[in-house]
């Protein structure tokens, strides 16, 4: 609670009073003599000594010589003021000023103190009379004779006390520590030496002779109101005493004064005395851990002075000196002994450990309700709502505000109904005023009657102060009557408001006026001769008068016990209100032993970063003091917090033992949900409070051990790692018990913490991964929503499935986290009871377990079980961290019974974590869980992937492991050792936008001899480009290497925000690796922390684990399924003129994959590298990239769905091209047309058969001798034919190969202009063309058909040059040749570019000899076709030079795979420049981003059944690769097709985006018109369906052009939550709504298909098929393909025609497929179908359709294209409309309503509506309603 706000008058009076006080003190100092400064009062706090000092001594102390005056051991003789020589002389001390005022100028010498007289041995120690050495007095009333007694209480505990033998002085009436009566012990860990003249005492550890406590350093001063003793300590490492703000856990020895006197004072950057009175400190002696503690049992005001050496001096204002010295072998033992002395901590109720919300001044109950509501809604784990004094009526205890908090009892019931608790505040001060309604205040009246108040010095008049309710009296909680009254008041109020716990505040005791309403008497109690360095230097400042009387004594003596006594009284009250329950007590003021009764918070802190940091020290100090349930006000009490501060504090506060968010009046709310339901603060708070609740069984067990054994809960690091001196100063991190290390972020704007990691094995709590750190300081990256949590190896942690309250979570299954330590062992324990009954431990009503792990066996041993209700709970999960080998078997046994196999377990190799689930190990029984560990073959990473066969000798020479496997195993026999660590991480720098790390080659570990020499220094850059996309790049920072010159669409600077990022990245060490983790699931989705990483000049290798076996992509290589086969398969990638075949690298190069994760999320990974490579897939699951050059430049896309991940990839590589509308029509081609007549004959046959058909091609046979830009003799009339069919709505596409003949005897402009413009690929550093041979024939050569292929090439093929399409001049030259051919020779509408891998019919060059073997035969040759024949096989030499557009020279070695890509954009641009239309470009060779410029066909396939399903795989893969316009040669390219195969392929091919029938020369015709009428009819029907659906299909093409994504869509993209779809590849979707299920097997008339979980309609009939979420066998007659429309979608259609020119003029139709709720949506994109960039220029029509029950509406989103003849709506077909008959259909259009004719099939729920006569066009909105 905050300080009172004083009025101006009050402030003026206070200032005046302070001035007067200062003057008075000055006078006292000046007049200081033997006579007391004030009159004595008759009933002194101590009986006056028999002998008093009445005269000044005649001599002063003799100063030591300078050599014997080490300044750090000076004991100050004038502690209360600035010293003067005169005062020093009066006190008989040595005056020797120094150049630093911190060092005493006046200090004691040997003339002060006491001498020993008559020392005797007693039954429990020694006893001696001490006589004062005659010397000047300091503060008067010295006691000349005192009694010194010692007690050897235990082997570890020694007590000595110094009292007045003649007069009883005040001694603390501690309620637990009683007078020791023996027996004594003889075998102690300590010796005690007493020096006699002068007296001093030494406590010495026997084992090493080290002096622990030595008072010889200074004199004993013992007067009535001033006691002083000093001790030298053996170590500089001192911890404890309080309550003050120390900032650091280890005490600063630099002349620090720490006053102790309980005070209502908020913590600050000063030495102010605060709320508690704690005199215990601990000192660690050395790295053996030996430590000791010192406790002074004294409650009077005092100060403790700490100075170098070190020396501790006590200056106490009364009572006695009563010291306890406690010895331990460890710091933890010392604290245990202290707690056993003053009282072990209370066992909290389980719910006390839940999170609490509070604030001062909610203002009304409605506000409290809103706070509770929003935090419930945010899912914040939250057990307790607290209200401060604002709930009270006029701040009076035991009342509530009936206006602002009306309904409070009902609200409390709501909390209870939700499993939550309610805690109220009670202040001790009781108002003497009346209630708001004028009635008497019953609480006050009953207290008066029972005489329960603290009285004035007369002992009978209640002292009156002022607190929150105004004028108040103060209960005397040391009075038994008061305790009864207090308990009764608590009980009465509980009957009205059923609170669950009590928060007692202001109990220092606090008053807002000094002393009382009457002031305070001038006497030695209110104005003692010595006042410690307390705030205001006034004893009764902000409290009551020191001469006030309580049952235990004068306020002067018992003031600091007020909170202690109130806690004891409140404990008794709780027992009355909650019989036999623990409840909850939170106190602000404390004393030694308060932890037996109450928890404590650190008071009214400030919302500042430094106070958050200091809270850790405060918490650790109270752990020493025996109050483990402690915490600070999370987010700060005073001042406005900030989101960042509060977020970081919530992270820390989630691990305070007492976790409460509380703030003050007048500031913004700071409960987590106040910051927004989706704020980073809420997410982070929810995450870490969820972790807290998960760990509550562990935390509760720690409290059990604190309660029974005195162990600390929030534990200083030094308590566990005392051998390491670095731990002695750690106070910005702490432990829970021995096992959980908590490292918060404590600095504003920081995301990296310099953290010390002690000497143990540590695991990241959240991932379970083992950390490489040990006994070192690290820069721990902790971004905005993270706190460091690490589990210590060697410990077993009990956990429980969390919930939002402990009421709920306690019912959930339990689990264990086993963090394996040294030798793979671990231990732990677990305590469980009902969580609320008092004394369950003492009564034995609990369950106790011990856990241990060794030899791969977990023993779960129940050592006590007497809580029957608890046995319904069970350990359901066991998570074992640090298992380096795979686990293949788990076995479980109960009570030493035989082991049984347990199958529900998973091993996470990335994190080396075994998770065993579904165990059902009920509490109360013993169990054993056993697992095996094997180094699985699947964990082998191939060390010898080379082309030659591996042998054991070669393997061991390489430094790898050789082990043969079974005959069936495909695992490598030569593999990397698991410890392979090729590179070490020199440094890793984390920032908000990425990571930079430097790697150094480990030459000492570089025994792995890979194919080429390694690069010694590497750099890793990770860039968080977007929230869902990141890049990680590994390169040589000292030498620029080739990087792919393909432009990508990535932000120039990262635009991600930490809070919204979907991923976290970590650089791993030993070995180096990168781990990327999906935040939402914690799943590691990239993990290259594996052996085998290599970065050589011509060999780069990196492996990564995969999150599942479901991976798709990589190409272009023929695959047998859409999902990759991970059974040790390697696929090479290097563009080659290679017809598709299993594992044969083919035309394109696409190093991209998409992976599904076990949770159903998806991500994509793209490696931007264009060098030859291969990728190995293994069942780990894992993959390994090997590439022969460039760098590693990865991009990852986080999805989280397959379609979204694909869109994210397309966003980077560019959205797919928008084809012309006509390009979606059916197309015909073949290689081998003899002349134009054959083409004409085909065309006429198709038209006669009325088979829809849009595009005709000719292959290279139309050319003269296969020369580009020529027309052969047999095709001289081709241009006229093309003009004719184009006039009939057809389109024409020609083929162009890149190879340009250089052997022409006549003018060949293409070559000649190419030479002039320097466009051809050349040998490096020369002007010579690198010649090759492809299709062009030599002029004037007769082809000998009998020659072999190679002989024919040599004999008849011309030398050809390859254009270098990287050059700007080449693009210009290419465009000119295309334009000239179009304008001068023949028209065309699209271009087909082939042979652009680039393909050559010779190896490298015309001589078959290249000039650089290192490039053509690299040290490592990827697993490619013709692996031993060199990279130049059937292409050009790798050393050929190409020139990028910026003039950079590059090797063909690096850019070979970019050749087709480099040709596509120039071809696309030239086509559009030439025709002025959109057109289409079809390319055989492709690279990522190619889809921006054109389409792709799947190459020269075979007329075989197995090539049909592979075409679906290929299309779906190219959909991932960003090329939506794809298809295969329908009916097959090679070999003669056959009737049934071609039938089924025509049915399938009708739904390829690129639908072309194409075959090779010298095989039979296979066009639809070439078979028979039945075939023609089938083709006509199926193509009519395609043409009908073209508006829908075109709209889908637009969607992915605008937004990325897939048109040919795998089922898993839409139905990823249905696991069967993950394997489906013989079906596919058009967009989201149209499913195609072809027949892919010969001579069958059924097809087995998976029907996803949605409503589906048979396209042919419109009927609901009534099947979903299962496999189904469908009929499929020879002329039928199964097509289904998904419910919930609207498909725009159009009547078909001969070609799209005519179909676009037909009526449109809408297929409305209703979902289960009679809802559906769809859209139409429409433009002129051929203009360039219509979408980009807004020249299009966009219509949105919606079905809502019985009403269909359209909404015009864009009206940039209007052609009413193309968009006339002719009909509407509603499928699945429902069973209600339709009586009427109404059209609302252009403001008019009209009835429409309709036809209804009620049985099949189909409604057909006719609009043909109403001239409705889709450019205007429509509404159609049926009823």
From Swiss-Prot:
One of its GO terms (molecular function) is sucrose alpha-glucosidase activity. One of its GO terms (biological process) is sucrose catabolic process. InterPro entries: Gal_mutarotase_sf_dom, Glyco_hydro_31_AS, Glyco_hydro_31_C, Glyco_hydro_31_CS, Glyco_hydro_31_N_dom, Glyco_hydro_31_TIM, Glyco_hydro_b, Glycoside_hydrolase_SF. Disulfide bonds join 63-94, 77-93, 88-106, 520-545, 635-646. Residues 110-1007 are annotated as: Isomaltase. Keywords: Cell membrane, Disease variant, Disulfide bond, Glycoprotein, Glycosidase, Hydrolase, Membrane, Multifunctional enzyme, Phosphoprotein, Repeat, Signal-anchor, Sulfation, Transmembrane, Transmembrane helix. Residues 40-61 are annotated as: Disordered. The chain crosses the membrane at residues 13-32. One of its GO terms (cellular component) is extracellular exosome. Belongs to the glycosyl hydrolase 31 family. It is linked to Congenital sucrase-isomaltase deficiency: Autosomal recessive intestinal disorder that is clinically characterized by fermentative diarrhea, abdominal pain, and cramps upon ingestion of sugar. The symptoms are the consequence of absent or drastically reduced enzymatic activities of sucrase and isomaltase. The prevalence of CSID is 0.02 % in individuals of European descent and appears to be much higher in Greenland, Alaskan, and Canadian native people. This is Sucrase-isomaltase, intestinal. Residues 1008-1827 are annotated as: Sucrase. Expressed in the poorly differentiated crypt cells of the small intestine as well as in the mature villous cells. Expressed at very low levels in the colon. PANTHER family: ALPHA-GLUCOSIDASE, P-TYPE DOMAIN-CONTAINING PROTEIN. Glycans are attached at residues 99, 437, 455, 823, 855, 904, 926, 1235, 1303, 1340, 1354, 1403, 1535, 1572, 1675, 1748, 1763, 1815. It is an enzyme of class 3 (hydrolase). Residues 2-12 are cytoplasmic. Residues 61-110, 932-978 form the P-type domain. It comes from Homo sapiens (Human). Residues 33-1827 are lumenal. Residues 45-55 have a biased composition (Low complexity). The precursor is proteolytically cleaved when exposed to pancreatic proteases in the intestinal lumen. Sulfated. The active site is at residues 505, 604, 1394, 1397, 1500.
